[in-house]
Regions:
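Active-site-proximal, substrate-binding regions of enzyme catalytic domains
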Residues: 2-109, 113-115, 122-137, 141-145, ...
Length: 191
């Protein structure tokens, strides 16, 4: 997934994985807020994150669920309805490629409201791009933009990645790569 650290659409509909990846690092989440990024979710994602029955909830999962509830009480990550007509409008149902309702509804709702979609699912990101949607973004892209624009410093990189790993998330390598891309982009912009 190619990213440009100099550009990031600040208003995004987040899918389930992105919600967890953003909230996995309090430092990343705080920097995104400071940069005036705004994230919302669809009711499908809300269900997957907080309502869907689970056999058991690991402590790190409970922590992320608690963080999401706290953010929602503060007005962030608000849930919005996405109807079947929204999904049909972009012919997503025919192109599902084993995507879940959370990813599909996030793409459809983002297109409907003409805002960004943030997904860390490669197939969902590709579907959004293939549908001609310019604002398909990822958590590593957000991270690289925050580094590039100076909202996160070089010293924050290890903190964000460590917090991410401690929360049981799995994109540490992508975050490291995004960090390196942001440094290269910053170097190129001053040359």
């Amino acid at each position: 997934m190619a990213i440009d650290p100099s550009k990031f659409h600040p208003v995004n509909v987040a899918d389930t994985c992105s919600v967890w990846n953003i909230l996995s690092s309090p430092r990343l989440s705080a920097a995104a807020k400071e940069a005036r990024c705004d994230f919302c979710v669809t009711s499908f994602v809300q269900y997957e994150c907080l309502i869907k029955p689970r056999k058991s909830i690991l402590p790190n999962e409970q922590t992320l669920m608690d963080r999401l509830r706290a953010e929602q009480r503060r007005g962030a990550f608000q849930a919005h309805s996405c109807g079947i007509e929204d999904l049909q409008a972009i012919e997503v149902l025919e192109k599902r490629k084993k995507l879940g309702k959370g990813e599909l509804s996030s793409i459809a709702f983002a297109m409907k409201i003409r805002q960004g979609v943030i997904t860390d699912d490669r197939k969902a990101w590709q579907l959004a791009k293939d549908s001609g949607y310019a604002y398909a973004q990822t958590t590593p892209h957000l991270f690289s933009w925050l580094i590039f624009t100076g909202r996160l410093g070089d010293g924050d990189k290890d903190t964000v990645i460590t917090q991410h790993i401690d929360a049981g998330r799995h994109i540490a390598q992508q975050l490291q790569t995004a960090y390196e891309i942001s440094l290269q982009c910053r170097l190129n912009s001053t040359a």
